[in-house]
Amino acid sequence: MKIRKSILAGTLAIVLASPLVTNLDKNEAQASTSLPTSNEYQNEKLANELKSLLDELNVNELATGSLNTYYKRTIKISGQKAMYALKSKDFKKMSEAKYQLQKIYNEIDEALKSKY
């Protein structure tokens, strides 16, 4: 019985030490990292859209001068949230900030149209 165990253990040691078994983990496929993934592409696209909305922030903030203080306060808060979301690069925060900015911009446009 001991002889059988020692033969089996020796054979197993020889098989595990062979180059076939030792090189198995080295042949793994590696993904190319030079091209952006779909998540990175969507995040970059959303960040660019949010930056363009932030570029319009000063114009819309000046437009609220003759409107209710609600608009001025809301646009400043939305602008700060958008800047924070851009720094964090979190998709959820960026999409929420983009939605808030678009919503307040539309509200300001409607308020200005109804006023003038």
From Swiss-Prot:
GO (cellular component) term, any one: extracellular region
Localization, UniProt: Secreted
Q: Which family does it belong to?
A: Belongs to the SCIN family.
In residue numbers, the region (Essential for activity) covers 62-79
Taxonomic lineage from the root: Bacteria, Bacillati, Bacillota, Bacilli, Bacillales
Name of the protein: Staphylococcal complement inhibitor
- Give the signal peptide range: 1-31
Keywords, comma-separated and alphabetical = Secreted, Signal, Virulence
Q: What domain of life does the native source organism fall in?
A: Bacteria
Pfam families the record matches: CompInhib_SCIN (PF11546)
- Function field: Involved in countering the first line of host defense mechanisms. Efficiently inhibits opsonization, phagocytosis and killing of S.aureus by human neutrophils. Acts by binding and stabilizing human C3 convertases (C4b2a and C3bBb), leading to their inactivation. The convertases are no longer able to cleave complement C3, therefore preventing further C3b deposition on the bacterial surface and phagocytosis of the bacterium. Also prevents C5a-induced neutrophil responses.
Tell me, in one coarse class, where this protein mainly resides.
Answer: secreted
